[in-house]
Amino acid sequence: MAYTLPELGYAYDALEPHFDAKTMEIHHSKHHQAYINNANAALEAHPELLEKCPGALIKDLSQVPAEKRIAVRNNVGGHVNHTLFWKGLKTGTTLQGALKEAIERDFGSVEAFQSEFEKAATTRVGSGWAWLVLEEGKLAVVSTANQDNPLMGKEVAGVSGYPILVLDVWEHAYYLNYQNRRPDFIKAFWNVVNWDEAARRFEEKVATCGCAK
């Protein structure tokens, strides 16, 4: 069963003025779709791998034939990352409860967490992602290059952990609206974080990868 583009669950202009509608439309319908197309092409001869949860597939790339591994890492990784990103966006939610308590425990304050997250997102050279992850019961901020995901583990991605929150810092995520002002885009992110989804991922520690095919 081939991967398909997941619905956002909200309109392209739902995150205005922080994330503009044109960027959201192109990012979702063009960029994400391209990763899906490439992932399906890479796995066309391996339907048994297409049946797996994409998150479970990238968590153990040794399942993938060596000649397809880079394509799967980049394109299934891109599919998983973008799906998590879309689910993590919403206006009007509030950080509270167990996740807020854990952030204050592990970073000292919400403000200190935000500062560390912004630094990780700002200093990621080139294309990549900033993440809040849960590893061995503790929250941490990490960043990955290209379409790597902490689920891939340290040997592949250089970092590891279970994704709670993620921000795309590829230029295509912000350039139409923010041009070279990546720090402004990162600041705007706090206005559209879906804290309810982040809390769900933290509290339930869901076993599935959280992404649709």
UniProtKB/Swiss-Prot annotation:
Lineage: superkingdom: Bacteria
Alphabetized Gene3D superfamilies for the sequence: Fe,Mn superoxide dismutase (SOD) domain (1.10.287.990), Iron/manganese superoxide dismutase, C-terminal domain (3.55.40.20)
Family membership: Belongs to the iron/manganese superoxide dismutase family.
UniProt signal peptide: none
One GO cellular component term: cytoplasm
Protein name per Swiss-Prot or TrEMBL: Superoxide dismutase [Mn]
Reaction(s) catalysed by this chain's protein: 2 superoxide + 2 H(+) = H2O2 + O2
The keyword Oxidoreductase appears for this protein: yes
Residues where Mn(2+) binds: H27, H82, D168, H172
Cofactor: Mn(2+)
Family matches, as PANTHER family: 37S RIBOSOMAL PROTEIN S26, MITOCHONDRIAL, SMALL RIBOSOMAL SUBUNIT PROTEIN MS42
Cofactor note: Binds 1 Mn(2+) ion per subunit.
EC number: 1.15.1.1
Quaternary state and interactors: Homodimer.
Chain's role: Destroys superoxide anion radicals which are normally produced within the cells and which are toxic to biological systems.
Biological source species: Mannheimia haemolytica (Pasteurella haemolytica)
